[in-house]
Structure formats: structure tokens, C-alpha cells
A protein has these predicted regions:
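C-terminal boundary and immediately downstream tail of ABC-type ATPase nucleotide-binding domains
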Residues: 12-20, 246-253
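ABC ATP-binding cassette signature C-motif
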Residues: 25, 31-253
Length: 253
């Protein structure tokens, strides 16, 4: 077993199940489990990607299998978000090949997507547009599954907290029961309870996950594979997160 997979199991074994008071029950987050697909879900061979025909990442040879939980490591500006966008179909390859399972559904979350929400609409209206055939009670139940209660669901997006916006984006990203979840800094606006709820939801999720985050607690409990994005390339990082963190500290001036 890879070192990070072993480290993750140890970290999970240390977690104690905490029973939350009823008033906090809405903090729970539930991701729907997709049907299993044959691996690989995604395969990239000799790929390069970037912006305006200028490559940011080159010589990409990557594979994502069903149930993989992958953390992208690397300094800011190395291309972690670029790789996330490529996997999420937000940008394309400049060279090489990218093949995906024909039935693959992808959910993508980025902290910058808050700009894509309609500020004068409520969370309920956002969901109603995405799921017009669902009954009012079904829509309320879906919102409740992401900790957005009846009162908050009727507030305009401009009036809800950053954490509630993040929950709404997570909900919209997972409506289609994605096989692959790509999450770029998902905990930035979440409070501690919501962060723990997200971790629990991701550890229970049966599909594949690709994570970009500075939250080492999240990464240590969710990821069992590490990819290092550095100097325009992406390669497996064979050590565990603790080794990576120690490596960063040693190299800091």
C-alpha cells in the first residue's frame, strides 16, 4: 500500500464519532453515491494544457480510477487549479490525448464560482432552475441535505454567508450524482462543523475525488493518493502528507 493510504487509515482510526446536538443536524452534508464505472474514469497520455496556447503543464501521463481519492500538492501558481479545470472540462488539452469513460459524470467546485451564482436569487430558486420537475418538498429536502435550512433557502444569495454559498455550490456540483468530484479549495469559507461534515461526506463517497486544498486535516483524512504539481509537470508523490509538510518546512527560507 502507498504510504499516504496507510497514513489515511491511521488518521481515520483515531477519529472519534461525535454525536451532534439536534440543532446542528443541518450541518451534515450528504453526497449521492454514483453507480460504479469500470476504470480508468480518466486517462491522459503525453498531454499538455494551459491558456492562450501557452502550456502551463506538459508531459501529463495520468490516470484516475473509480474510488481514487487524490490530493494535488504544490506551491501556489504551479498549476493545481489548471489541472483541476482540465479534468473538469473547463479547459482543453493543447497536445496529447485525454480519454474518459463514456458514462462519466463530473462534479466541479471552485471557490471562485461564487461569482457564477445569481445574487438576486435564493438557493431555492437556484435549485428550482436546475430541478424544475422536483416538488417543493423534494427541493427543500435536497437543500436540507447540504445544511441549507428553510429560512436560508429563501434568502437572496447576496444575503447569505460565504459558508452557505459554498454549500449551495457543493449541492449544485453534485446534483447529477457525479462519479468524479473535483474540489478546488472547498473548505475556505466553511466553519469548523461544516468542514468536518464535508470530510465525513467525502470519506463515505464511493466515487473518485480530486482535491486542491491548503487544509492538511482535510487532505490527511480523505486522500489516499498524492500528486505533486511542480515545474510544469505532475507526478505521483510516493511519501505521505507528513513527509511533504516536513519537506516544505525544511525548504522555507
Amino acid at each position: 500500500k502507498a504510504k499516504q493510504a496507510q497514513s489515511r487509515l491511521k488518521a481515520l482510526s483515531k477519529l472519534k464519532t461525535i454525536s451532534l446536538p439536534k440543532e446542528r443536524a443541518l450541518k451534515e452534508i450528504r453526497f449521492p453515491d454514483p453507480e460504479e464505472l469500470a476504470s480508468p474514469l480518466v486517462a491522459i497520455e503525453d498531454g499538455s494544457t494551459g491558456y492562450n496556447k501557452k502550456a502551463v503543464l506538459t508531459k501529463l501521463n495520468l490516470r484516475i480510477d473509480f474510488s481514487d481519492k487524490i490530493a494535488l500538492l504544490g506551491k501556489n501558481g504551479e498549476g493545481k487549479s489548471t489541472l483541476s479545470k482540465l479534468l473538469a472540462d473547463r479547459i482543453s488539452l493543447l497536445n496529447g490525448s485525454l480519454t474518459k469513460s463514456s458514462k462519466l459524470r463530473i462534479g466541479y467546485f471552485s471557490q471562485h464560482q461564487t461569482d457564477e451564482l445569481r445574487k438576486n436569487e435564493t438557493p431555492f430558486e437556484h435549485l428550482s432552475r436546475a430541478r424544475p420537475n422536483k416538488s417543493v418538498s423534494e427541493r427543500k429536502k435536497i437543500l436540507g441535505g447540504f445544511g441549507i435550512g428553510s429560512d436560508q433557502s429563501e434568502l437572496k444569495v447576496s444575503a447569505i454567508s460565504g459558508g452557505q454559498k459554498a454549500r449551495l455550490l457543493l449541492l449544485l456540483a453534485t446534483l447529477d450524482n457525479p462519479h468524479l468530484l473535483i474540489l478546488d479549495e472547498p473548505t475556505n469559507h466553511l466553519d469548523i462543523e461544516s468542514r468536518e461534515a464535508l470530510i465525513e461526506a467525502l470519506t463515505k463517497f464511493s466515487g473518485a475525488v480530486v482535491l486542491v486544498s491548503h487544509d492538511f486535516h482535510l487532505l490527511s483524512l480523505v486522500s489516499d493518493k498524492l500528486w505533486l504539481v511542480k515545474n510544469g509537470s505532475v507526478r505521483p508523490y510516493e511519501e505521505d502528507l507528513e513527509s511533504y509538510r516536513a519537506d516544505i518546512l525544511v525548504k522555507k527560507p
